[in-house]
Design a protein with these regions (language model features):
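Bacterial Sec-dependent N-terminal signal peptides
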Residues: 1-27, 236-239
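Outer-membrane beta-barrel biogenesis signature
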Residues: 18-43
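Short, solvent-exposed beta-strand-terminating loops
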Residues: 45-47, 98-100, 201-208
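Flexible, solvent-exposed loop segments that connect beta-strands
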Residues: 55-65, 97-124, 157-174, 210-225
Length: 239
């Protein structure tokens, strides 16, 4: 699924490039020539995500499989210009993701269990607030590639952290507040009326997110040492 998303992203970006033919080989009329000279600019983004978990274990047993699904991102952008090559960006948004943990039946050796106990679906809705620095190349006709990186904080609205029911009642609990670092690449494309930006970004949690079950011998959490989110964002920005 992630490969299909990436291929779609690449074809979409290529189609934009083709509509802006001869970008590199010929001087051409510049769209929105003074757009990047504004000290402040605003916009919004829409996109997709694929979230995963990086899990460290206390003992060497069969890994928990993470079944990924495509999620959705939407948010706003505030951009502060430093100079022609550096910008600071704030991108508050809403991120919705879905993952399923699939356990081997070896986790339940000696225990009575049902088939449904082998999976735990984790639906997450984050209020996601990245603070980023954007480093751009020199503008080439109507495009400008860039890299971006920074840190973000996220509030998981569906964490179940304070839920008194744990996995014994079907609830996998996670912490509410998380911190990530982010790294990405993208291309600003200057169209006639606005700037369009496709980008790819990796997000990586800096905190252990799992909340252990009340039972210290729980088959779902007792062997997890750390569990951290990692994910891929594909965003389309309009400014």
């Amino acid at each position: 699924m992630r490969t299909k998303i990436l291929i779609s992203f690449l074809f979409f970006s290529i189609s934009i490039f083709e509509s802006e033919a001869q970008l590199f080989t010929k001087e051409r009329l510049l769209n929105n020539e003074n757009f990047d000279k504004a000290p402040l600019s605003y916009g919004y983004y829409l996109g997709f995500n694929s979230y995963d978990f990086n899990i460290d274990y206390k003992t060497n047993v069969k890994d928990i499989q993470v079944l990924k699904a495509v999620g959705f991102n939407v948010g706003l952008i505030g951009n502060v210009r430093i100079n022609d090559y550096f910008d600071i960006r704030l991108e508050p948004g809403l991120v919705m993701s879905n993952r399923t943990l699939s356990y081997s039946n070896t986790y339940f050796d000696g225990l009575t269990y049902e088939e449904k106990d082998l999976e735990r679906e984790i639906r997450s809705t984050y209020i996601h607030i990245p603070l980023l620095i954007k480093i751009s190349t020199k503008r080439i006709n109507n495009i400008k590639p860039f890299i971006v990186g920074g840190i973000s904080t996220a509030l998981n609205l569906s964490s179940n952290q304070d839920n008194p029911d744990d996995n014994s009642n079907g609830n996998f609990r996670m912490i509410k507040n998380n911190v990530f670092y982010e790294l990405g690449v993208g291309i600003d494309i200057y169209l006639t009326w606005f700037k369009f930006t496709p980008s790819l970004r990796g997000v990586f949690s800096l905190k252990d997110e799992h909340v252990p079950d009340f039972d210290a011998n729980s088959p779902w959490t007792s062997n997890i040492d750390q569990m951290q989110t990692r994910g891929l964002f594909i965003n389309f920005t309009f400014q």
